[in-house]
Amino acid sequence: MRLIGMPKEKYDPPDPRRIYTIMSAEEVANGKKSHWAELEISGRVRSLSTSLWSLTHLTALHLNDNNLARIPPDIAKLHNLVYLDLSSNKLRSLPAELGNMVSLRELLLNDNYLRVLPYELGRLFQLQTLGLTGNPLSQDIMSLYQDPDGTRKLLNFMLDNLAVHPEQLPPRPWITLKERDQILPSASFTVMCYNVLCDKYATRQLYGYCPSWALNWEYRKKGIMEEIVNWDADIISLQEVETEQYFTLFLPALKDRGYDGFFSPKSRAKIMSEQERKHVDGCAIFFKTEKFTLVQKHTVEFNQVAMANSDGSEAMLNRVMTKDNIGVAVVLEVHKELFGTGMKPIHAADKQLLIVANAHMHWDPEYSDVKLIQTMMFVSEVKNILEKASSRPGSPTADPNSIPLVLCADLNSLPDSGVVEYLSNGGVADNHKDFKELRYNECLMNFSCSGKNGSSEGRITHGFQLKSAYENNLMPYTNYTFDFKGVIDYIFYSKTHMNVLGVLGPLDPQWLVENNITGCPHPHIPSDHFSLLTQLELHPPLLPLVNGVHLPNRR
């Protein structure tokens, strides 16, 4: 989740005593560009030219003290307006489209003939000033409006009572990328990654565009469980799962559907009372027991790893260690039945292991260094887990790369970030700009696959060969709020062992625009994140005989 919050910056209304400068003919001749973001129309005007609605650069429009009896719906085309004054006109109604002008901070409707207001005004979640005095509005509306913080209360009331359109979402498309191998033995399984938006983060301060009833956990949890159950993934990685909800909702509901699970809360839970601990969020992994058997489970506390590897770095202690994000990992044994039929089975002594890792990195955009180091710490710990798992009796080989890895995460990092570069390219320069020129160099080598005393040639490397399941901009965004729309959730997999057969595509972006959905959650979308879902094809590292010959791994 990207906790940037609703815009509450100080708003300065236009100055009525402003002085304009008219360009001279010489300035015009010399090509000087004019800039005007405000427009005032006065003189007892009765109607407005349609060309006005093409001035989309306007931020302030003064239409007060005229004789306007109606405002056309096309006013909503002025999407950059933050100030609109319609006071002292002859308006008896307002267009519902006014509610689409979500940039508005000030809307003045004083001294008109308004008896009702369109409930769509409730969508103006950034509005700080609403002028309604001098209108014959109902007592219900005026009593709310005249309360302390009346503007906010009235807007919330209208948003909560606004009818929801459209009635349902269009289906997300399944994008097939490759057909399953029909010659070599392979196992196919699906993986979901989903940030479910923890209840304590789902506030009107952050998501003012969403009705309060649709932010309520009792409402949202139905949509979240519907999303999870509908796609029926073999492996499910969830972030922002509240501790109490894991034990009372997610685990019981998914156990009934043939899953087992593992969960760990953020590190802060350790120092909290039992009651407070219930509301700490964390990461969970679920897997279908008919397809996988749990071998090991692990929690990685980033603040503990940071403390153990600080090597005297103040930045490590003051910036990284203070964040209590965590990751979880499970080592699973893949059931032999998954490897298809009609082919020579894997040797009975071979056990195909799979590691699934899930993490949620720090949210703040100003802490790109922390996100990158948290990712390095997590991958380094996963490498340790793999090394231990690969040396277990019955495991195929001592090489950690022989055990395939699926890494799911809300990385809170865009595709062009150091975090994604590190995961995708096998490493990152130790002077990468995301480190912000802070002194991390010594301790970073603890997380490089070459080791503290190895030759790194100025790079921090991890040794895995990972690839994102969602490449080539298959998703335009995974997090969709008013403030921010971008890809920050990922599913990575070991490309030496696996192929992507397909992924769940995006919700139609045009549909979101056409229905004026400026951010999620929404009555039809229960989280501010969209789920990721991929179907992976796994080939065992040691392939069986085909016609008496060992076929090499094609990857």
From Swiss-Prot:
Question: What does this protein need as cofactor?
Answer: Mg(2+)
Annotated region described as Nuclease domain, given as residue ranges: 158-555
Q: Where in the cell is it found?
A: Cytoplasm; Nucleus
Which sites bind substrate? 240, 276, 360, 365, 412, 479, 484
Q: Which domain of life is it from?
A: Eukaryota
Q: Give the binding site residues for Mg(2+) 2.
A: 410
Per the record, a Pfam family?
Exo_endo_phos
This chain's function reads: Poly(A) nuclease with 3'-5' RNase activity. Catalytic component of the CCR4-NOT complex which is one of the major cellular mRNA deadenylases and is linked to various cellular processes including bulk mRNA degradation, miRNA-mediated repression, translational repression during translational initiation and general transcription regulation. Additional complex functions may be a consequence of its influence on mRNA expression. Involved in mRNA decay mediated by the major-protein-coding determinant of instability (mCRD) of the FOS gene in the cytoplasm.
Name of the protein this chain belongs to: CCR4-NOT transcription complex subunit 6-like
